[in-house]
Amino acid sequence: MKIALVHDWTIHMRGGEKVLDALAELFPGATLYTLFSDRKKLSPNLRRLRIKNSFLQYLPGIRHFYRWLLPLMPFAVRSLQIEDADLVISSSHCVAKGIRKPAGAFHICYCHTPARYLWGFEETYFSRFIVPVRRLIAFFLDRLRRHDLESNAGVDLFIANSECVRERILKFYKRDAIVIHPPVDI
């Protein structure tokens, strides 16, 4: 069975990347698709994978300003072409679940959370900006929400990392999920 792993970005080893590391240990022959990465910051399991990055990888200094590129991320993840896979496993808190799966492939999304800055925590993320900037952000957030909802169509099975996330998936995506707690200390 050919397996593709997908993660939003891999530039450090935080909670989501530790889950991805556990998946890489289970599927050492998988290819990893990600928006951008920094191999030097990754675990040995992740460094051993074949890594395919989006065009965002080639922007100088991407690690320092990637949050400002959020409006481009849905396009970037859709630009990644999974060459051949029977199973796609996305580890997603942003746009990874929006990857195009090959015909006949099954897509499991291990959802760390529906994107907080889109669903319920906008004030936490954007209240510090002046009003004209917040209006511009609201314009993009509306489009990003639509993309986020549309990208759910390609997911065959949602796995939530907690009961709280399962409830958020049900509330915002109108999809059920099974709960599998992270297999790592986070």
Mark where each language-model region is.
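Short beta-strand scaffold positions
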Residues: S90, I159-A160
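Nucleotide-activated donor-dependent transferases that construct or modify glycoconjugates
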Residues: M1-M13, L35-F36
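Acidic anion/phosphate-binding donor-loop and adjacent secondary structure
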Residues: K171, I178, V184-I186
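Active-site proximal beta-strand in glycosyltransferases
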Residues: L87-S90, K101-I130, I178
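Active-site donor-binding segments of glycosyltransferases and PAPS-dependent sulfotransferases
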Residues: L26-K97
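Membrane-proximal helix-turn-helix segments that form the acceptor-binding/catalytic region
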Residues: F126-F158, R166
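Short amphipathic alpha-helix
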Residues: G16-L26
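Carbohydrate-associated surface elements
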Residues: C164, P183
